[in-house]
Swiss-Prot record:
Glycans are attached at N78, N175. SUPFAM superfamilies: Ribonuclease Rh-like. Rnase which modulates cell survival under stress conditions. Released from the vacuole to the cytoplasm during stress to promote tRNA and rRNA cleavage and to activate separately a downstream pathway that promotes cell death. Involved in cell size, vacuolar morphology and growth at high temperatures and high salt concentration. One of its GO terms (biological process) is apoptotic process. Its EC number is 4.6.1.19. It comes from Debaryomyces hansenii (strain ATCC 36239 / CBS 767 / BCRC 21394 / JCM 1990 / NBRC 0083 / IGC 2968). Belongs to the RNase T2 family. Its main location: other. This is Ribonuclease T2-like. Residues 1-19 form the signal peptide. The active site is at H84, E143, H147. It is found in: Vacuole lumen; Cytoplasm. GO terms for cellular component: cytosol; extracellular region; fungal-type vacuole; vacuolar lumen.
Length: 403
């Protein structure tokens, strides 16, 4: 009877909702869902704090379904964008990453296929959730450890203790991510408006924007590579209730496309070969701030009196950049300070690097501040940690100066 009552209340709520899509479990309820109020607001729209973190996703209230079109080397089917992930971004566009090591996993296949026996889900993941290097499993693990550990509403504590089994949150994340991807067939959206892969035909930004907006209902972010070719598409959503309820509400993208206004390529898979490419070597240079005295030394601290350290910046396997000095890889410590030493794991510290401005960012934020409360020494010889700005300090950019 309880299940029936809960089912009815959810269905009534859905009929009055603006949500475009939702999946319910076979019993008519979402497994292990908490007793969430039916009138809980969409994420990022609340005027007062929501205490129940099992019913309201925060701070990652923007959910992005991200898809890639990898044409060289060709990844995935010729008529499908591949799934990259489901990301919880903060309402201001910044984001957390690798939030809880205790939730990390080492295998996705064991959980989806062996523990839960879901051959259908595993088959879909294998076909559409592809890694450019051929190791799909490593991408699935990375996406969970980096992003899903930051999703508060699918923490194990948000499940009914009597019905929760180990790794149910992992299985749910993969299943929900795939469900949302299947509702966003980017290739078909574009093809329906005459935008198809071609080595000769080129398209305008307006054509692509109008096509995606028509079928998603809101403005969509799309990204081009250095060849002015379409490569990524991101769909932004707010969420109502727990992620387990899959009550996504489309919203406009909060960032602008980098694609040119005209002559955008949509290159067929197997239809492009750039020729021999020189090996990529790490960029090397100083980390400093234009007009600001000082720079970063090898331990990651800001110093005014000495010689700047040389930092190497290179791309990570799954996106983002890793930074290294003579002391070791660099990352953000438990106090939120930039630090470099041999204990830092670069795979858990993905920085951003804007090639045009040469600015370094972390978690979507490119503003840094001096943590003067924890400086070492005084005067010109003081060594001061830097941290990502919280909006309450005198911020400055950290810029890479190539040698």
């Amino acid at each position: 009877m309880l299940a029936l009552i809960l089912t009815i209340s959810i269905c009534i709520f859905l009929k009055g909702s603006t949500c475009s899509y939702i999946n319910l479990g076979s019993e008519g309820i979402v497994f292990g869902a908490p007793n969430c109020p039916v009138d809980i607001p969409l994420t990022c729209t609340n005027s007062t704090p929501i205490d129940n973190s099992c019913c309201f996703e925060s701070p990652g209230g923007i959910l992005l379904s991200t898809q890639f079109w990898d044409y060289y080397p060709p990844i995935g089917g010729n008529e499908s964008f591949t799934l990259h992930g489901l990301w919880p971004d903060n309402c201001d566009g910044t984001y957390e990453q690798f939030c809880d090591d205790s939730l990390n996993i080492r295998s996705a296949t064991d959980i989806v296929l062996n523990q839960f026996g879901d051959k259908v889900l595993y088959g879909k993941m294998s076909e559409f959730w592809k890694n450019f290097n051929g190791n799909d499993e490593s991408l699935w693990i990375h996406e969970f450890n980096k992003h899903a550990t930051c999703v508060k509403t699918i923490r194990p504590t948000c499940y009914d203790n009597q019905r929760y089994v180990k790794n149910k949150n992992v299985y749910d994340f993969y299943n929900i991510t795939m469900n949302l991807y299947e509702k966003l067939p980017t290739f078909q959206f574009l093809a329906a408006e005459g935008i198809v892969p071609s080595l000769t035909q080129k398209y305008s930004k307006k054509q692509i924007n109008d096509a995606l907006t028509k079928y998603f209902g809101k403005a969509v972010y799309f990204k081009c590579n250095k060849y002015k070719a379409l490569q990524e598409v991101w769909y932004y959503h707010y969420l109502q209730g727990s992620l387990k309820e899959e009550n996504f509400s489309p919203i406009d993208t909060i960032i602008n496309s980098n694609c040119p206004e005209e002559n955008i390529q949509f290159i067929p898979k197997n239809g492009f070969n750039p020729g021999p490419q020189p090996p990529k070597s790490p960029r090397k240079g100083y980390l400093e701030s234009p007009g600001k005295k000082g720079c970063l030394i090898s331990n990651g601290l800001w110093y005014e009196a000495g010689t700047c350290a040389t930092y190497a910046i290179s791309q990570q396997e799954f996106g983002g950049y890793k930074i290294r000095s003579s002391k070791g890889y660099c990352g953000m410590n438990s106090q939120g300070q930039f630090t470099c030493n041999k204990q830092v794991d670069p795979t858990k510290n993905q920085f951003q690097y804007n090639k045009d401005t040469r600015k370094i960012g972390y978690g979507g934020n490119f503003a840094w501040c001096l943590d003067t409360e924890h400086k070492h020494g005084d005067g010109k010889t003081a060594q001061t940690p830097i941290k990502i700005s919280d909006g309450q300090c005198d911020s400055f950019p950290v810029q890479y100066g190539g040698k």
